[in-house]
């Protein structure tokens, strides 16, 4: 359905943008793009770990986020269109969930590497940026008619 696609695009745009901001924040501190070399950041940056967890759970379409509403609309529409799409969509959701959790666990958990001992804490602007990504997701989750009203 058009409303499901629109809802999912807006939710995906906010969640993906939050992921990219978090990845850039990690890169600015570690000067490294390899997830295995950036492990254990939860010990040094607990608030950043919270933002990673929030982005991961939002990406998993955790209820009651707007991501879940969009995915439910798209899944029900595609299932009524063709039964084979439900298998492909389910597989896609499983792979996305596994990768999101793998990325969170790899970056946040584990033992610290030796080059990350002297790391700067997150700036207020970075925390505000993450909040500015999360606020629309929460507001749209509380009142999805903001999106659905335009598409129905």
Swiss-Prot record:
Disulfide bonds: none annotated. Keywords: Electron transport, Membrane, Mitochondrion, NAD, Respiratory chain, Translocase, Transmembrane, Transmembrane helix, Transport, Ubiquinone. It is a multi-pass membrane protein. Its main location: mitochondrion. GO terms for cellular component: mitochondrial membrane. It comes from the Eukaryota. It catalyses: a ubiquinone + NADH + 5 H(+)(in) = a ubiquinol + NAD(+) + 4 H(+)(out). Its EC number is 7.1.1.2. The chain crosses the membrane at residues 2-22, 43-63, 84-104, 128-148. One of its GO terms (biological process) is ATP synthesis coupled electron transport. Core subunit of the mitochondrial membrane respiratory chain NADH dehydrogenase (Complex I) that is believed to belong to the minimal assembly required for catalysis. Complex I functions in the transfer of electrons from NADH to the respiratory chain. The immediate electron acceptor for the enzyme is believed to be ubiquinone. This is NADH-ubiquinone oxidoreductase chain 4. It comes from Macaca fascicularis (Crab-eating macaque). The gene is MT-ND4.
